[in-house]
């Protein structure tokens, strides 16, 4: 059955819908553009067929500028009163713009009173669905009651959006719940390109979506974005009155940004909320505050029966409803590639999250950064609630979250209400849970016992936890560090550390009701940190038992010690095992003020108990666990304990200093190798000009040079590369002798593959002579020879980018000479097959010398480098092949040679660290002492005056490679 929508006006309400109807009414939707501002009349349509209706689009349908808000019979543009309603887009556009109504669902509504769950409303197959500036206002009854109406789309039936390309709900407004969509069950899935709820607002609850049974945002490949939505009371973007909300499998991420309400800045839920297996989940700049409000309607809506809880959950509020009696309602975030809560704000509690039961686990990365609240800068757990944090697939980090109650803000990650607790606190091997902001807790109820929390449990559904839990003041500014509250965490819970590591760093304090430690776990403390029991009225017997305590040597400053303090009146402190020592960094002993001298009575550990019950019977102070640092100050420790004060101190005996690899500076001596390598490249480019020719010539050559030395046991990898130009002149001064003069410039850079980078500007000059008659009278042993001297002066600059120290910079100049003397025996050929002109066996003596003077860096940790030089003598032996092309006078040359280094003084220099007087030798790379040389050049005459040429070469050693490429042109006179 088919009919046109323009004639399909049904207003009567039919019998209740039936699930097993024989046929569905099929309606063909026209391709139209209805614009009320042009006077075109829109046929408001009501569907009431209990068999259900299938609307099939034949094209795009645009509906704009309609207003029936003042009508006593105000209605939706499309209304359904019976049967299921399916709207099939067929790739078309479905658009509503500037629609105003005083009915529920300004654009579309489906209100079924009997068995609504059997009559779903569905939208599928649209290229675009647009609901822009649709407004649902209030209406009054004959009894003068004001009824607030809701949403652009309203349904008492399940609602489904599936397989659409783009969905946009923008700038919609309503007096009732949900400005964009309100329904019992809302499912949006398989959206392909865009899913955006932007700028929607409700005077009451649910700025974009309101659901009473379920909200599902699942399996969308499009980004899911809720932006700048707002409400007058709850749920800036989403309001869930019961049931559950599932956001899962969204491939391009989920983003809630700039949403606002009085509670639940982005989401307010009285049902379960689950985020799972999305690519990215981000909540940014959402706010929950009593000051957040849209203008109230006139007259205002009836006040709620329960006083609103305002200013809670900057991003998400998730608790059971006040009535009926609370049931298990939880917020779960798991399986995400990344989770980010950034700069969300709540005026009261939970800058990011506020919930009775919250679980965050199995995410690859979780970050709470810069969130703010009165209590619980990132997370707040109300009375008797619970929180589970598991870093089992990635790290969890809390940093720069703030609590602002009055006066100066303080750092605060989590706040536990009265009797609230951790249900799970753990990290698996290789992952860490970082608390750079402390945890705060309300006091226990008078009759309540402290809950027991197993930290890093041995066995769980996720396997054994053996990762690290860190409490640290590392990211505090100097001003923040001066306030103890910024680094003091309080947990009114009994902690049992079963596995992994609990680390207290950078001045952090952890107060717990009771603390015990399993033998397979480790407690690491910095000097200046404290592990203590709480000292409130509800904790009279809290105790601390440690069996594997480790002190971080990085943190020692000679004044502060790690402190273990049992503050409860009857509690005992028991410590056993061997005191461990750890270095968090390989250069921990580079503390000049601390370790550059022998030390006595260095504070290490203080053990305290209000009851004076401190047991150290099985506590050992042996130094077997101390491993000498491979770098920095070398020495030995000796520890003692005062049995009266229970204070552990240490004596340090300095034995020497070993520089960290970052200080070794191989680039300084290697700069001499760079000079020699550059001059060899210049020599090859000059020889490639083709010097055994009559007449005079002037050539200009572009030079490129690349060198890499491999990492060896004695030296790290080294790379040098550069480019420049050579201007060369040539003249034959006698029939048997020629002279060549050249000069040029190179621009180079080098690096040592760790922290050193160098740049240089090289100026050079070269002199060449060639003799083509016998060097020994009538002897034909050498019938020709060449000689060349090349000099360079380079201006060097090196920057050392230390990992922890300020960058070091220095500059200086190097001088380098390269002398070459060659004897050869040309053999003239006339080969028609290879067209070879000649073969020239040769032997050459090459002497290279480079030197630099003293050098000093310009930082407090700067080094002083002494004089250094390089001397290398090589004797290349090889053969040169010359070939004429069939289009003479073009010719080609190939050189193959073996070049052993018969003598070498490898470059090095004495290095001093003035800040402590330590000295060592900086050593350059020791290249393999033999090399294979292969070069090729080509010359092409453009005319009798102009010639162009190219040259390439490689120098292959077992531990290094050098490559050159030169292109030039020559003028003959």
Curated annotation (Swiss-Prot):
Pfam families per record: Chlam_PMP, ChlamPMP_M
Keyword Membrane appears in the UniProt entry: yes
Annotated compartments: Secreted, Cell wall; Cell outer membrane
Segments of skewed composition (Polar residues): 284-293
Cellular component GO terms held in the UniProt record: cell outer membrane; extracellular region
Keyword Transmembrane helix appears in the UniProt entry: no
Stretches the record annotates as Disordered: 284-303
Keywords: Cell outer membrane, Cell wall, Membrane, Secreted, Signal, Transmembrane, Transmembrane beta strand
N-terminal signal peptide: 1-24
Name used for this protein in its record: Probable outer membrane protein pmp13
Recorded name of the encoding gene: pmp13
């Amino acid at each position: 059955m088919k009919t046109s929508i323009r004639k399909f006006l049904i207003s009567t309400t039919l019998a209740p819908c039936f699930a097993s109807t024989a046929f569905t009414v099929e309606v063909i939707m026209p391709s139209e553009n209805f614009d009320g501002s042009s006077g075109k009349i829109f046929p408001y349509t009501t569907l009431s067929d209990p068999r259900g209706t299938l609307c099939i689009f034949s094209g795009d349908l645009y509906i704009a500028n309609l207003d029936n808000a003042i009508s006593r019979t105000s209605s939706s543009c499309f209304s359904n009163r019976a049967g299921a309603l399916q709207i099939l887009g067929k790739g078309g556009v479905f658009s509503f713009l500037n629609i105003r109504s005083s009915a529920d669902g300004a654009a579309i509504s489906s209100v079924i009173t009997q068995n609504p769950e059997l009559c779903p409303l569905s939208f599928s197959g649209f290229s675009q669905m647009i609901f822009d500036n649709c407004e649902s206002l209030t209406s009054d009854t004959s009894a003068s009651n004001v009824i607030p109406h809701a949403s652009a789309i309203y349904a008492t039936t399940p609602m489904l959006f599936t397989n659409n390309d783009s969905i946009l709900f923008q700038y919609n407004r309503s007096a009732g719940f949900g400005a964009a969509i309100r329904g019992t069950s809302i499912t949006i899935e398989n959206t392909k390109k865009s899913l955006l709820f932007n700028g929607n607002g409700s005077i009451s609850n649910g700025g974009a979506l309101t659901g009473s049974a379920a909200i599902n945002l699942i399996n969308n490949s499009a980004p899911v974005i809720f932006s700048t939505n707002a409400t007058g009371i709850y749920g800036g973007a989403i309001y869930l009155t019961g049931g559950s909300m599932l956001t899962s499998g969204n491939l391009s991420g989920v983003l809630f940004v700039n949403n606002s309400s009085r509670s639940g800045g982005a989401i307010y839920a009285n049902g379960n909320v689950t985020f799972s297996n999305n690519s990215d989940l981000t909540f940014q700049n959402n706010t929950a505050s009593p000051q957040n409000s849209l203008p109230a309607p006139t007259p205002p809506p009836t006040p709620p029966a329960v006083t609103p809880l305002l200013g809670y959950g900057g991003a998400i509020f998730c608790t059971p409803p006040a009535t009926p009696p609370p049931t298990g309602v939880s917020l779960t975030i798991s399986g995400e590639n990344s989770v980010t809560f950034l700069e969300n704000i709540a005026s009261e509690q939970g800058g990011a999250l506020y919930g009775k039961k919250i679980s965050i686990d199995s995410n690859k990365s979780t970050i709470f950064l810069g969130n703010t609240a009165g209590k619980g800068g990132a997370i707040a757990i109300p009375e008797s609630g619970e929180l589970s944090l598991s870093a089992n697939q990635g790290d969890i980090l809390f940093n720069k979250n703030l609590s602002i109650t009055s006066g100066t803000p303080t750092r605060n990650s989590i706040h536990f209400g009265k009797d609230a607790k951790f249900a799970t606190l753990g990290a698996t091997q290789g992952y860490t849970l970082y608390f750079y902001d402390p945890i705060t807790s309300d006091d226990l109820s008078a009759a309540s016992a402290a809950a027991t929390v197993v930290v890093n449990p041995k066995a769980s559904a996720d396997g054994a936890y053996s990762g690290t839990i860190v409490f640290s003041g590392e990211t505090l500014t100097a001003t923040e560090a001066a306030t103890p509250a910024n680094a003091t965490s309080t947990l009114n819970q009994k902690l049992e550390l079963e596995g992994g590591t609990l680390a207290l760093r950078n001045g952090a304090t952890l107060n717990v009701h009771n603390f015990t430690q399993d033998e397979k776990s480790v407690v690491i403390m910095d000097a200046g940190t404290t592990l203590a029991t709480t000292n409130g009225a509800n904790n009279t017997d809290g105790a601390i038992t440690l069996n594997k305590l480790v002190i971080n040597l990085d943190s020692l400053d000679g004044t502060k010690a790690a402190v273990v303090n049992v503050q409860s009146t009857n509690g005992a402190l028991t410590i056993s095992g061997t005191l461990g020592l750890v270095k968090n960094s390989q250069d921990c002993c580079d503390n000049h003020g601390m370790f550059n001298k022998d030390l006595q009575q260095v504070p290490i550990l203080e053990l305290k108990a209000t009851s004076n019950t401190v047991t150290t019977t099985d506590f050992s102070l042996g130094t077997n666990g101390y491993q000498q640092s491979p770098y920095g100050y070398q020495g030995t420790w000796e520890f003692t304990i005062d049995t009266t004060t229970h204070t552990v101190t240490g004596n340090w005996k300095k034995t020497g200093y070993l520089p960290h690899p970052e200080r070794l500076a191989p680039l300084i001596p290697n700069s001499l190798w760079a000079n020699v390598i550059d001059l060899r490249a210049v020599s090859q480019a000059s020889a490639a000009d083709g010097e055994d020719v009559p007449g005079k010539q002037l050539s200009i050559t572009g030079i490129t040079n690349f060198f890499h030395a491999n990492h060896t046991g004695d030296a790290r990898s080294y790379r040098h590369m550069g480019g420049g130009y050579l201007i060369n002149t040539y003249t034959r001064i006698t029939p048997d002798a020629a002279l060549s003069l050249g000069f040029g410039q190179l621009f180079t850079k080098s690096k040592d593959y760790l922290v050193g980078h160098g740049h240089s500007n090289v100026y050079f000059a070269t002199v060449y002579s060639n003799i083509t008659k016998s060097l020994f009278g009538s002897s034909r042993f050498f019938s020709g020879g060449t000689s060349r001297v090349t000099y360079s002066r380079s201006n060097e600059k090196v920057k050392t980018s230390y990992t922890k120290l300020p960058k070091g910079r220095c500059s200086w100049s190097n001088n380098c000479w390269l002398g070459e003397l060659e004897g050869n025996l040309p053999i003239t050929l006339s080969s028609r097959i290879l067209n070879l002109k000649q073969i020239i066996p040769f032997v050459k003596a090459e002497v290279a010398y480079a030197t630099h003077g003293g050098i000093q860096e310009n930082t407090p940790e700067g080094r002083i480098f002494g004089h250094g030089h390089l001397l290398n003598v090589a004797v290349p032996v090889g053969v040169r092949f010359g070939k004429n092309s069939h289009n003479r006078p073009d010719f080609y040359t190939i050189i193959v040679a073996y070049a052993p280094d018969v003598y070498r003084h490898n470059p090095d220099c004495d290095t001093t660290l003035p800040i402590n007087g330590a000295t060592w030798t900086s050593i350059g790379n020791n290249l393999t002492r033999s090399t294979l040389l292969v070069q090729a050049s080509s010359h092409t005459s453009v005319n009798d005056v102009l010639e162009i040429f190219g040259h390439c070469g490689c120098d292959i050693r077992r531990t290094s490679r050098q490559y050159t490429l030169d292109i030039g042109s020559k003028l003959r006179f």
